[in-house]
Amino acid sequence: MLLEVEKINTFYGLSHILFDVSLNIDKGEVVVLLGRNGAGKTTTLLSIMGLNAPKTGAIRYQGQEVMGLASYKIARMGIGFVPEDRLIFPDLTVYANLDVGRKSLNGRKSKWTFDRIYKLFPVLKDFSDKPGGDLSGGQRQMLTIARTLMGDPDLLLLDEPTEGLAPLIVKMLADFIQVIKQEGMTVLLCEQNLKFALKHADRAYIVDNGIIKYQGTIAELNQNTEIKKKYLAV
């Protein structure tokens, strides 16, 4: 098992957000965490990444306990996080933004080179000398993902990657997920675009009010109209 999340309880101040949340991901899987706005999807990713550490429970990555570690240490272990708000350095060029991701390796070699990134996201090559702040929302999303890849993660956490993007950009992100899936990269995806999620994931969890209400394969979820209607408003 690549990632094991076991009965974590996460709080924002005194507010209890996640209740005994458990999930697991095998190497090479694409797993989607579904749920309405405010259900606890993003908090789950923040908990895994150490950005909002749970009070109780356990999080193991490749068999090692990571709960309580600083987020940069978790990243160095091989977990990459792409947040929903597409954080980039707007005053740095696209190239320099990517270089920030590469420098996080601390001298280790990455299978993700500039050439490979530019092949995957050609628009970043076209704008490599432009400030990141000049990019559109979709281009910033590509840059955020690409910069994370430069750190050579084995597990990629994607938080609402299609939110607010044009259909053409969503198609490019779909192609990207297929590429990294074929290469055996593991992905945990939080997504409200149900059509996108069901097309590209292997398994799904549904979270509602901070509680995991369902888990199963995509085929099983597709057949379960009651669950989709109850928790996903389908």
PLM-predicted stretches and their roles:
Residues 13, 54, 92-112, 120-125, ...:
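ABC-type ATPase nucleotide-binding domains, specifically the catalytic core motifs of the NBD
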Residues 34-36:
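The feature captures the beta-strand-to-loop junction immediately N-terminal to the Walker
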Residues 49:
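Helix-to-loop junction immediately C-terminal to a conserved catalytic motif
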Residues 57-66, 77, 110-114:
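Conserved ABC transporter NBD signature motif
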Residues 131-135:
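Conserved ABC ATPase signature
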Residues 148-149:
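ABC ATPase C-loop
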Residues 156-160:
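Catalytic Walker B motif of ABC-type/P-loop ATPase nucleotide-binding domains
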